[in-house]
């Protein structure tokens, strides 16, 4: 994601670090094959995580989350407003919220079974909420005895679900509006379809691209720390 922040900055200012007229698919494929570039960006992420963690719980992690989480919500809202106001974005909203619409309109061949839905949602739930990983034991060791655990648990679940819905509203409407044939899932949705969307927004596209990929960087760093 740091790579794509740099890419959009390059496109915004016409610098050499931009896409330089290459197709988004070629940019993504080239990055996957470029081991040196992957190592560099990986090290940048590791160093960034280390610097935050070295600040301790209150001076590093809490300070970052205190700034990063509000910034994440602001960037999400900006991207949602832009995505949902694009011509054709309504099809993305129908895909997300209208049962049977995707099958009826040929977006997907057939609806997944209830067991597939439960399996996918359950896997995401366990991963997103860090259930069964021992993470809560680690976090719990830093909590004050006056903390209301039940209230915090409910709040975490509600906010996690809200952010997931907001992320969907940020991505899916844009895909249907500006890249209707783009991938609907996996890394290609993030790095090919969404970059296509930003490339087709015109002059403001790189700005929204920078905001979007910074948003993903914030989310990744908050998970890594």
Identify the meaning behind each predicted range.
Residues 48-52, 137, 225:
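Alpha-helical transmembrane segments in multipass membrane proteins, preferentially the mid-helix core
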